[in-house]
């Protein structure tokens, strides 16, 4: 039981050694330990402050990015609307121009057809006139021998002329 109840000499030396160790620690160890704890506390405080600032910057950056995205979406919508309007305008202009060109071609074709028709009619009239003169000449040679036949022919031609004019 000597370990559980130490002698007074042992107790004296233990107190002395403890006191010396305590004084040495108090003079050299505790200031270093408290300084390190204070430095660690300052480092943690600085880190917390930096983290808080980083979170604020992140929130600001996030708000800025959302604002930029909103502007980009607005710009995209504006550009798309302009593109649609431009496309519609171009299509309308092209359609109008195509109608104008089509009408122009149609008018030219009508003029050309009318000119060809007039040319064909005048050509046919000329041919009919030539044929009529040839036929009349042959008929007249044959029929003009008799005066009675001449009068009948003149009457018939006059009747045909009045009927064709009506």
Curated annotation (Swiss-Prot):
TM region positions: 10-30
Role summary: F(1)F(0) ATP synthase produces ATP from ADP in the presence of a proton or sodium gradient. F-type ATPases consist of two structural domains, F(1) containing the extramembraneous catalytic core and F(0) containing the membrane proton channel, linked together by a central stalk and a peripheral stalk. During catalysis, ATP synthesis in the catalytic domain of F(1) is coupled via a rotary mechanism of the central stalk subunits to proton translocation.
UniProt xrefs under Gene3D superfamilies: F1F0 ATP synthase subunit B, membrane domain (1.20.5.620)
Subcellular location: Cell inner membrane
Keyword list, A-Z: ATP synthesis, Cell inner membrane, Cell membrane, CF(0), Hydrogen ion transport, Ion transport, Membrane, Transmembrane, Transmembrane helix, Transport
Database matches in SUPFAM superfamilies: F1F0 ATP synthase subunit B, membrane domain
Assembly notes: F-type ATPases have 2 components, F(1) - the catalytic core - and F(0) - the membrane proton channel. F(1) has five subunits: alpha(3), beta(3), gamma(1), delta(1), epsilon(1). F(0) has three main subunits: a(1), b(2) and c(10-14). The alpha and beta chains form an alternating ring which encloses part of the gamma chain. F(1) is attached to F(0) by a central stalk formed by the gamma and epsilon chains, while a peripheral stalk is formed by the delta and b chains.
A GO-annotated cellular component: plasma membrane
Protein name in UniProt: ATP synthase subunit b
InterPro entries noted in UniProt: ATP_synth_B-like_membr_sf (IPR028987), ATP_synth_b/b'su_bac/chlpt (IPR002146), ATP_synth_F0_bsu_bac (IPR005864), ATP_synthase_B_chain (IPR050059)
Topology versus the membrane: Single-pass membrane protein
GO molecular function annotations of the record: proton-transporting ATP synthase activity, rotational mechanism; proton-transporting ATPase activity, rotational mechanism
Family: Belongs to the ATPase B chain family.
């Amino acid at each position: 039981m000597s370990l559980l109840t130490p002698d007074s000499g042992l107790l004296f030396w233990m107190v002395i050694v403890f006191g010396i160790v305590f004084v040495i620690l108090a003079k050299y160890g505790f200031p270093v330990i408290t300084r390190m704890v204070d430095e660690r506390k300052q480092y943690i405080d600085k880190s917390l402050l930096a983290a808080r600032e980083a979170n604020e910057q992140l929130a600001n950056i996030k708000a800025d990015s959302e604002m930029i995205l909103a502007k980009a979406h607005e710009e995209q919508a504006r550009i798309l609307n302009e593109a649609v309007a431009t496309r519609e305008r171009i299509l309308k202009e092209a359609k109008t121009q195509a109608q104008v060109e089509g009408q122009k071609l149609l008018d030219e074709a009508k003029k050309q057809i009318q000119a060809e028709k007039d040319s064909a009619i005048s050509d046919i009239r000329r041919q009919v006139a030539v044929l009529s003169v040839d036929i009349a000449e042959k008929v007249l040679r044959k029929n003009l021998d008799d005066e009675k036949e001449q009068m009948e022919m003149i009457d018939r031609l006059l009747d045909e002329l009045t009927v064709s004019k009506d």
